[in-house]
Each structure stands twice: as structure tokens, then as C-alpha cells.
Amino acid sequence: MSEMLKGIAASDGVAVAKAYLLVQPDLSFNKTSVEDTDAEATRLDDALAKSTEELQAIRDKAAQSLGEAEAQVFDAHLMVLSDPEMVGQIKQNIQDNKVNAEAALKEVTDMYIGMFEAMDDNAYMQERAADIRDVAKRILAHLLGVTLPNPSMINEEVIVVAHDLTPSDTAQLDRTYVKAFVTDIGGRTSHSAIMARSLEIPAIVGTKEITDKVKAGDILAVNGIIGDVIIDPTDAEKSEFEAEAKAYADQKAEWDKLKNAETVTADGKHVELAANIGTPKDLEGVHKNGGEAVGLYRTEFLYMDSSDFPTEEDQYQAYKAVLEGMEGKPVVVRTMDIGGDKELPYLTLPHEMNPFLGYRALRISLSELGDGMFRTQMRALLRASVHGNLRIMFPMVATLKEFRAAKAIFEDEKQKLVNEGVEVSNDIQVGIMIEIPAAAVLADKFAKEVDFFSVGTNDLIQYTMAADRMNERVSYLYQPYNPSILRLIKNVIDAAHAEGKWAGMCGEMAGDQTAVPLLLGMGLDEFSMSATSILKTRSLMKRLDTTKMAELADRALKECDTMEEVFALVEEYTK
């Protein structure tokens, strides 16, 4: 008899296949006394080396199949493995207490995990606890000679079922064989869900009990569009899901026909659909999906993929490659956004209780520590500007004083290059990322001095709602459609237009099919998203009338008190 479970729709698509249970191995061990502590330390070093090699391979594969943005999660894991303080404490534990490496590892990592988890009001520390837990599990497996699940070995069509999928699990999924995945826990903004959308694998998370209900080999029918899973579907249900899968495949084929088309609404208004990228390699996805621009080039990956500060020439070559690759189409380059969850092994930053609200991004660039890095980046960008349509964007701007200071450095380096006889473009737009509520509220003042705005909704929502989207205990407050968020976005768009400037968006909300009608109605000029969302969004835009969507946005802003009311109104206007 079939049974239906409801979960969170995390990645679109429909699939019917047998279940493959991703079961975690038994990593239990006995604490033992040892005489040869040097031998135990050597065992630990071997396990660390194997873990590093594995994670580096997984990271490289993730960068290739998912892009640098999704691969960066593994940088935090690699930094845990090379943390001299933690590794030193484990070895000291072996030496002082004459215990086996397994026991020393568990004692030290449990101490760190407990310490970070105790800071339950600090999302950054919660994430560090999760990183250490994942890495400790991998090291322990090597110490015990136990093989961790390897999803990359799956060689038949299956639907992966797990309590949760770590980023390393998800990055190893081969979409040739893995038709979908379903988990007990997780949310739409979890790392595994974001990776699933990049891989274009249907996914449902947060079912609470899928692993209790399913056995290996059970047939599952998954609809990642609405969040339904049927266990052991009847022939009729199976046929229905297979028909839905075909309909979805046909729909995707229709979207593919729009690859070379401009994005035009039902009433003839052109809207720019751009892509977010992390490296020049990501341009392949932009072209494959018909991107009209690069709306966000995350330059921090140049720094994160290097063992030392990238030189001016290294940066120039990367920026040149992207600008030339886009053949005159706009490229918005975000200056270095280091700090928060993005650390560099060769840049020592002060320890902070909450790095997300601390010393990061433009705050580093404008400091004595970051001045040289920032000026080098400005020179590389200015030199590359002659190869395409460059736009420069400063992240984490809270005050006009910060923008003016950054713009002054840009002008200073530009003049130096001109004096050196180096050709630079005189048509470079300079704008800011709106991700701090203070900047959104003062958008009318900023608009007089910037050339454009790009709304970074991921952080804007977190900072406005005081809720970390990766923290499941408060994730219900991560509300892109909360009227307060919509009002801030509308304020930014109106402020830009009042000064004859353009406003874009580069957060996940820009590619959200529920948000697009609202944002179009508010007058957003540019939507920048994961490249895989572009064709679907272009198809939606073709069906939307800007006058009708403006009415929708106006009503949402004036009449709605809650996120649920906004949802209902959007459904009324788009059904």
C-alpha cells in the first residue's frame, strides 16, 4: 500500500526510481592506553593527510560541476584539517594522557563542538561546530579503517534517501544515476538544497521520517516542485508521476528554445537576466543558459583558491578572461568579500564573536590591513576594463563615507595608471551592493552618488529579520516575502530611478519564481541568479504584464501584513 510524505520542495523536478539508503557507518571505538605515543601521532597525521586529499578532490569536483560559489563550503573543512591549534591539542592529548588517537581526537573535537554549540545565539559559531563535526567524522573513519559512504560510486538509477546530506555527500552525486534525493531534515536554503539546484537534481528535504519509512530498493515517486514523496506508489500513481516527469522534461525543452532570445515581458518590456559567477570557468554555464550579463562576479574566489595573495597580473588575467568572454555584455564585479565565513589561510584576521557583523568585505579593504590588497585589485580591474563592459560593485556598504572612501581609492589608482601611460576605460560604472538595512533606508542619498544598486537579498533578509538562514531554529524568520523586506527593496528601486540610475538584484530571491512577478512589478531592472534558473525565469517573464504586476506589487506593499498574505496575493495574480 502506498504512503505519501510531505516535505520541503528544495529543487524542481519529478522522478520515479528505487531507493538507495545512504547509511552512515559505525564509528564506535574503545578508548585505550598506548605506550608509543609517537606512533599514535603518526597514525593521526596519516588520517589527516588522507582526509585532506579526499576533501580537496571533492572540492575540485564540486568547483567543476557546481561552480566556485558552492565549492567554497569545503574551504572551511580544509581549514579545520590544517588548524595548528586544534591538531596540536589532539597530539598533546595523545602525549600527555597516553591515549589512542581516536580518543584524543574525539575529546578535543567534542570540546570545540560543545563550546561553539553553546553559543546558540551565534549562527557563525553553529556553522563552525557543524564543520568540525563533519571533519572529525572523516578523520575518525580513516583512523578506524572504515569507509565512509561514497555517493560517486552509485552506478544505477536511484533516489538517494538519507537523514541528511553533507555538502561532501551532495557534491559527489552523479546526476546520470541519481534521479533525486530526499532527507529527514534540512531547509530550502541548506547547502545540500542549493547544490541540488545547481546540479538540477530534484530534491525534497525536511520530511522528518523518510529514513524510518523506506527500505533499500523500495520504489519512490518524488515531485520536487511541490514537495511530495510517495513510497511504493500504485501503478496509477507511478504513471501519474512519470507523466509529470515527461511534462517537466518537455517544459525544460521549451525553455531551452529561449537560450538566444531577449527577455521580454508580455507587454514588450525588456528586462535583463544575468548570472552569478565565481570564476572564468563559470562562463560556460552563462552561455549555455543564455545569460544577458554577469550580474555578480564574486572575486573572493581568486583569493580563496590561492596559497598567497593573488598578484595584480593574476587578477588582471582573470578579469580580462571574463570581460572578453562576455563579448561586451555587462559584467558586475564585486570587490573582495573576505571575512564572515570566507577565511584565507594567509590572512590573519582578529577572532570575533560574530564575524558576519564584524571585520569583513569593504571594512577590510578600507583598513590599513587591506589597503594594499584593495589597491592591487583596483589596478587589475582598471587595466582589464578596456576588454569589455566593466561595472564595479562594493560589498557591505553601510555609510556614504565608506562608499566615498572606496570611490576615492578607485579614482586615485585610475589616475596613477593614466600617469603611467596605461590605457583604462572612461566608462566604468561604480555601484554598491545593498545588503545592510542602513544602506537600503538611505538609498535616496546613495543614489545621488552611485551609478547603480544591486540588492543582495541573502544578507539583507538576515540582517533585517535578525535571523540566520542556515540556523534551523530560526529559519522560519528568514522571510523573503515579509512586507518589511519588500518595502526596503521598493525603496531602493525607487531611489535609483529617481536619479536616473538602475537597480538590480543578485541574491537567491532574483531567481525565485514567486518573487519574480513582485520584483518586476516594483520596477527591478536586472535579475541576477544561478545560471540554471535563467531560462525558466525568461519563460515566466514572457507571460507577465508589467502593468498588472505593478498593481500586484502596489497591493502587496499597501495591503499585506504577513508573508502568507503576500503569497496568496501573488497566487491570485499569476494563476
Curated annotation (Swiss-Prot):
Disulfide bonds: none annotated. It comes from Enterococcus faecalis (strain ATCC 700802 / V583). General (non sugar-specific) component of the phosphoenolpyruvate-dependent sugar phosphotransferase system (sugar PTS). This major carbohydrate active-transport system catalyzes the phosphorylation of incoming sugar substrates concomitantly with their translocation across the cell membrane. Enzyme I transfers the phosphoryl group from phosphoenolpyruvate (PEP) to the phosphoryl carrier protein (HPr). This is Phosphoenolpyruvate-protein phosphotransferase. Homodimer. Belongs to the PEP-utilizing enzyme family. Its EC number is 2.7.3.9. Its cofactor is Mg(2+). Mg(2+) binds at E435, D459. Pfam families: PEP-utilisers_N (PF05524), PEP-utilizers (PF00391), PEP-utilizers_C (PF02896). GO terms for biological process: phosphoenolpyruvate-dependent sugar phosphotransferase system. It comes from the Bacteria. Keywords: Cytoplasm, Kinase, Magnesium, Metal-binding, Phosphotransferase system, Sugar transport, Transferase, Transport. GO terms for cellular component: cytoplasm. The reaction takes place in three steps, mediated by a phosphocarrier histidine residue located on the surface of the central domain. The two first partial reactions are catalyzed at an active site located on the N-terminal domain, and the third partial reaction is catalyzed at an active site located on the C-terminal domain. For catalytic turnover, the central domain swivels from the concave surface of the N-terminal domain to that of the C-terminal domain. Phosphoenolpyruvate binds at R298, R334, N458, D459, R469.
